[in-house]
Amino acid sequence: MHEMALCESMIEIIEREAREQQFSRVRAVWLEIGALGHVDPEAMRFCFSAVAHGGIAADARLEILEMPGAAWCMDCAKTVTIAQRDAPCPDCGGHHLQITAGEELRIRELEVD
């Protein structure tokens, strides 16, 4: 389960920001997860709870924002929304797509004290 390692890294980032920005508690974390990133939101919630236990984010809410996948179709020269990596262009059916969004995993916002 790679979500555990992702959450460990996320907590490290939050703790570093707490030292730099001088906050002592995290109330909420807004996390952007791309639809094409192979990250399970429910596994992230479970792992975040386990990794955050006893630390600065122990009681924090994890709000997950699922970001859609997008690609540039080289056949029809359009940006299109896609649900999976190997999907054809929904407009022209072409398979020459360059992923432009949906792979991200980003802490968007923290609510802190």
From Swiss-Prot:
Record's InterPro entries?
HypA/HybF (IPR000688)
Quote the record's binding site residues for Ni(2+). 2
Entry coiled-coil feature ranges = none
Does the keyword section mention Zinc? yes
Q: Name one GO molecular function term.
A: zinc ion binding
Record keywords, A-Z: Metal-binding, Nickel, Zinc
Q: Name one GO biological process term.
A: protein maturation
Question: Record-annotated residues binding Zn(2+)?
Answer: 73, 76, 89, 92
The record's comment on protein family reads:
Belongs to the HypA/HybF family.
* Stored PANTHER family: HYDROGENASE MATURATION FACTOR HYPA
Q: What does this protein do?
A: Involved in the maturation of [NiFe] hydrogenases. Required for nickel insertion into the metal center of the hydrogenase.
Protein name stated in the entry: Hydrogenase maturation factor HypA
Tell me the organism: Rhodopseudomonas palustris (strain TIE-1)
Taxonomic classification, please? Bacteria, Pseudomonadati, Pseudomonadota, Alphaproteobacteria, Hyphomicrobiales
